[in-house]
């Protein structure tokens, strides 16, 4: 269980935040405490690929996996652990830091969502999530259009995550899912990219509908 976005809220007020059920507790209630290994890290909090990782599991699973981890490394990067502790200090320090992330990300998400609603709302050619956290907007096109949309956007200069990237081996049976990642570009570039994207959605959808 990849718990990568446990503190990645876009809004400060708790009523505007999403919280998942604690899966380890639910597994124990269901009589299957050993079903899940839960992983998290500060990779999307401090340093991508160079953060601090953590593993949560049942006592039996932790006892088992320690045998393998002990062989894999005889010493963790304690200096990296120390600098994280000194910087964040405690959980409140993590939350305070993530509010700074949210202040950067929130306007980007809201702009993309507003563009999607203005240009595609009510047309019946696309649906999308309005996430309260994390790094992605999930977009559902008409069946058979996702790869076409991403390819058209690339031709126009907007490089997106490959269509179907969220599916095992990238194979989306309906060819309809596109993962929009608004986090990286400056908002000025993102505005242009969002306009290109909605035009590509319209063009690909019209081509599909005319061919039917």
Language-model region placement:
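PLP-dependent enzyme catalytic core of the Aspartate aminotransferase-like
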Residues: 31-32, 155, 170-212
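Residue-level detector of anion-binding/catalytic polar loops
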Residues: 159
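Conserved core segment of the aminotransferase class I/II
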Residues: 25-106
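Short beta-strand segments
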Residues: 1-3, 40, 54-56, 129-130, ...
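Catalytic PLP-binding core of fold-type I/II PLP enzymes
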Residues: 1-17
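Helix N-cap motif at beta-to-alpha junctions
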Residues: 142-146, 185-187
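Short, solvent-exposed loop/turn elements at beta->coil junctions and helix N-caps
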Residues: 40-43, 125-126, 164-169
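Conserved glycine-rich beta-strand-loop-beta hairpin in the small C-terminal domain of fold type I
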Residues: 99-113, 125-140
């Amino acid at each position: 269980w990849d718990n990568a976005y446990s503190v990645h809220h876009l809004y400060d007020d708790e009523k505007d935040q999403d919280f998942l059920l604690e899966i380890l507790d639910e597994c124990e209630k269901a009589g299957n405490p050993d079903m899940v290994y839960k992983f998290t890290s500060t990779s999307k909090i401090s340093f991508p690929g160079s953060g601090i990782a953590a593993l949560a599991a049942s006592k039996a699973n932790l006892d088992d996996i320690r045998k393998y981890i002990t062989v894999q490394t005889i010493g963790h990067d304690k200096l990296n652990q120390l600098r994280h502790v000194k910087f964040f200090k405690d959980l409140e320090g993590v939350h305070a830091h993530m509010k700074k992330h949210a202040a950067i990300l929130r306007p980007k998400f809201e702009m993309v969502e507003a563009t999607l609603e203005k240009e595609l709302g009510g047309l019946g050619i696309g649906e999308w999530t309005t996430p309260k956290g994390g790094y992605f907007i999930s977009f559902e096109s008409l069946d058979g259009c996702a790869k076409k949309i991403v390819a058209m956007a690339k031709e126009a200069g907007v490089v997106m995550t490959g269509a179907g990237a969220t599916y095992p081996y990238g194979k989306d049976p309906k060819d309809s899912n596109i993962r929009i990642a608004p986090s990286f570009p400056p908002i000025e570039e993102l505005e242009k990219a969002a306009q290109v994207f909605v035009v590509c959605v319209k063009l690909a959808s019209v081509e599909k509908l005319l061919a039917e």
